[in-house]
Amino acid sequence: MLRTKVFATTVARISGIRRYIPIRTINTVTKKNISKIEKLCEVLEVNPDGYKGKERIPTKELTKLLYTTSRNMLVRVPMTGDLSTGNTFETRNETLQKLGEQLIHLEINKMLTITFTNFNQFNIMNKNFNYIHNLDRARVVNMDSISWLIKNSLKINQLAHLRIPANLPKEMGLTSSSNDFQNLNDWKVILSFIGYLKLLEIKNDNKKFIESIIKTICIPLINYHLRKS
């Protein structure tokens, strides 16, 4: 029954038929789940000698933990365990490195095509970014890491589904002291700025301009939020 509904919804969207189907967002970011996720993260630890490489994260179990399903979900997360996305993620920050690898292994690019009725109901990166906020270690993003997210994590044709506000810079705040910014979750900030910068990239063919915005606005704001307790 569920498969039939999902298939019918998918066909309706492809064919251009619009109809309202409520989407229920279930928050699975609890202390119990965070503890489970941290244990799963241990398999990504780099061996001290640096030669044996990293073990693969148990994608199937992590996916079950992070993504809840209900009768109102339009798309169910595929649990194939396939990790071959062709992307790479490298940063000196160990925690962010783990996060980036998980995003790749969970094939976040495919999941971003899900349509949501409201921007606040975006329920994918929420699960990936929220648990990292609770780890007792320094968290920081740099030019390389955020550039990977911008260039490889989102595609322009997927941004249409996210309903990014037209006045996003004003809403998100351009300084780290902005009250608007402080009230937002880090996953919203990252996702919104990535989307905004990708939209700018269409209108402006100036890479230095984009890099300047990333360096002066995007990275400081994200790091400011990640440092909050």
UniProtKB/Swiss-Prot annotation:
Main localization (coarse): mitochondrion
Record note on what altering residue 124 to T does: Loss of function, causes respiratory deficiency
Domain of life of the source: Eukaryota
Span of the transit peptide along the chain: 1-25
Keyword Secreted: no
Consequence of changing residue 129 to S/T: Loss of function, causes respiratory deficiency
Outcome reported for the amino acid change (mutating residue 100 to A): In CBS1-1, which is respiratory deficient
Keywords, alphabetical: Activator, Membrane, Mitochondrion, Mitochondrion inner membrane, Transit peptide, Translation regulation
Localization per Swiss-Prot or TrEMBL: Mitochondrion inner membrane
A molecular function (GO) term: translation regulator activity
Further information: Present with 556 molecules/cell in log phase SD medium.
Protein's job: mRNA-specific translational activator of cytochrome b. The cytochrome b (COB) leader RNA may represent the target sequence for CBS1 and CBS2, tethering the COB mRNA to the inner mitochondrial membrane, where cotranslational insertion of cytochrome b into the membrane can occur.
Name of this protein: Cytochrome b translational activator protein CBS1, mitochondrial
Source species of the chain: Saccharomyces cerevisiae (strain ATCC 204508 / S288c)
Lineage: Eukaryota, Fungi, Dikarya, Ascomycota, Saccharomycotina
